[in-house]
Amino acid sequence: MSLKFIPLAALLASFLPLIAIGQDRTYDLYVCAAVNRNYVIGSKITTTSGLHLRQANGQWAHVGINDPSIFAVSFDPRDHNTFYTAALNGALRTVNGGDSWRVTTSWDITEPKDVCVDPHNPDRVYLAHPGGIAVSDDRGMTWTKRERGLPDRGKYTQTIEVDRSRKGHILAGCESGIYLSQNDARSWRKTLVTEETVNDVQQSPHDPDIWAAVTQSAGAYISRNGGRSWTAFDQVPSEAALYNIAFDPTNPGRLAIGSYTYGVLASEDGGATWKPRNEGLPKPHRIWRVGVDPDSGTLLASLYQKALYESSDFGKTWKKAGLEGSAINSFVFLPNSRK
């Protein structure tokens, strides 16, 4: 499947006729994906990596620059033509839907792993990177490190999320645990101690007090008080890495975990019990990331350098959904203007 480089503004306009005759989705799905199976330096294979947008007909279109190192993307809720990516060479920003880009960080902030626009103050952007946490209060023009309360050793930060219901509350997943800030990242306190890196932290779309987290090899956890304390999911294995966790926005009891070792793990009772949901997926079940479509409840799973797969019954059966040869680093569902 060929992928085209198309500016986002033009891309959205071109989709309107397709949307009219296709499924009326209220969310657009973006993925950050490296589509580079079998590629080596010097190879003549053409790859198209970076940000991809699912079209109304189910096909995928490339948006912006060709970069296999884009780990995450976050949009300005006031203007979806403005968004930020976390990539190998720093935090990048576009203000014209991906037509042009600017690296906004300097030499001392590289290889960020996650980026998050503050929904309470969209001029503020948070960045998780190997050296800790950085914040911009001017839409990425300048960055300040905000690490008070983080340890000198163990502040490598993999993921960062802003509490959508509490202004100033942020949760960060670091190599030494989960840290909570209640003052716009001016200070941090540890609320979960782990011996391995916290790979993902997510807030429930149903109850803002509920958060879930997964780790490199220290299991998975749930918080029912806004991240102030955590309890382990007893039935989730902890011997190997868990890459991410996703809530089902259409069903409060459903959660899914993606793991390179265990494949897809699913719960339909709020995390009390978990089952592998790999039947029908190619072996080995090397799941890179999972996501859940807020329009349909469709479970999505990225098989490392294989393809994207989808399930309409939360993992009991699967079918291929494109992006051959890809490894998806993140799923982002963005409310669209047709909502």
Range-by-range predicted roles:
Residues 1-8:
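Bacterial N-terminal signal peptides that target proteins for export
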Residues 8-12, 18-339:
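Extracellular glycan-interacting surfaces
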